[in-house]
Regions:
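Cytosolic covalent-transfer regions centered on His/Cys nucleophiles
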Residues: 1-123
Length: 123
């Protein structure tokens, strides 16, 4: 699995301007949907928000990786977004997140999201 196989040009947004964490998640969900990776955007976003309730995916150093497994996902995929002004994503270091990678995996897809996180970490 390669990052370039998971990330389509239509799922990338530079100079985004979400104001809140929820805005950022909705914007990334829209990018994921534009890439053709979702069968049910609302179901996927519900899973992402549920995942965020268990703990923020704001990693620190300006990076966030919101993700979820969901029946609303057709295939494993990525969406990417740059937010120059940053968004408070409740990161461990308290700094705003500026670089976002949203990870989508189909429900029951073993550890696909973990594999994608691992690949992102080595970039």
């Amino acid at each position: 699995m390669k990052i370039t196989d998971l990330l389509k040009p239509q799922s990338i947004l530079l100079n985004a301007d979400p104001v809140t964490k929820a805005d950022a998640i909705y914007t990334l969900g829209e990018l994921m949907d534009k890439g053709g990776h979702l069968t049910d955007k609302a179901e996927y976003l519900k899973a992402v928000f549920a995942r965020e309730e268990s703990g923020s995916t704001g990693l620190g150093d300006g990076i966030a990786t919101p993700h979820a497994k969901s029946v609303g996902v057709k295939e494993a995929a990525l969406a990417a977004m740059v937010v120059p002004n940053g968004v408070d994503f409740e990161a461990l270091d308290g700094q705003p997140s500026r670089l976002f990678f949203m990870i989508a995996a189909p429900e029951g897809a073993a550890d696909t999201h973990v594999e994608v996180l691992s690949k992102l970490a080595t970039m």
